[in-house]
Amino acid sequence: MVEANHILQRSGENFKKFIFSFTDQNGRELCLRPDLTIASCLRYLKLNIKGKEKIFYNGEAYRKSQNRADSIIRSQIGFEIIGSKNEKKDDKVIIDTALKSLQNLSYTSGTLKIGNVQIFNLLIEKLDIPKRWKLRLVRHFWREDYFNDLLKRLETNSDVDPTIVEVDKKRYKNMLKDDKKKIIAGRSIEEILNRFNKKIKDPRRTNEGKKISQIIRKFLKISCPIDQAAIQLNSFFKKNDINIFVEQNYFSISKNRIMKLDVEFSASFGRQLEYYTGMVFKIDIKNKLQKKNILNGGRYDKLISNLGGKKETPAVGAAFNL
């Protein structure tokens, strides 16, 4: 049992419909744990552990599913590395551990899909859009439908409220009469007027918003064998004059096929849980009867601090769904 806000805080409000929650006699909203990663982080905090810890666990998680045939009780086996600063090495250790664990399973084929939320965040940071838009796009990356609505608004420049513009114009005219060196809320009137001129009198052109939106949409469509990931990403960034370069060894895996798994990169993959901050991956396997998602994992460097830790703590892990 955990407090529901621990889950919703970093998994997103949309995730709420999948958890089993109730309110106790003190008004606290509690829920059955929907996964064991957050439970492991809460334990790390409770024990006041300093530095690196490797965790192995097995237990049950409780989550509703869109498929009524799925069980609400999910048995999981997981492994985490918390508090280590060797990010690339740890990412590889987690993926390698996951692959080794497949050796005793019977399956005919499968897919190891890899994404990286950090690359998306870097892209947004480099785009020539107002800071408020950067914050919105990063914050709502996990809410796919709402994120697409934001891209449509970006295309039409519809975030400018005409009512607010009229009020600002009145303030603008009054400020023109004031001393330009006068300070208001930490900025000089001259700075405020310059910003107003840039934002309102010469707003971002609609075609600029369309261009930015198209760049984001095209980026999210990048999907390829893992050995082509750096090549395709760098080609995309160069074509769109974006100052980002991905090294060939950036990804923990470079082979397109490992065991019976095709290894793929997807720029849009990683939108399931809001607490992911870097590398994310999943393994789906097939046998004669069905295709099944057997494992999910990724890096979550901000989860410890968001759950009450005093600082960000590097962490990465994965869990099997049995």
Give residue ranges: language-model regions:
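Short coil/turn segments at secondary-structure boundaries
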Residues: 53-57, 135-136, 152-154, 267
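Short terminal or interdomain "cap/linker" segment that borders an active site or interface and mediates
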Residues: 116-117, 121-166
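Positively charged, Gly/Ser-enriched RNA/tRNA-binding surfaces
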Residues: 2-4, 35-49, 55-107, 159-322
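Glycine-rich loop at the start of a catalytic domain that most often binds anionic cofactors/ligands
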Residues: 6-21
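Acidic surface patches and DE-rich sequence motifs
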Residues: 24
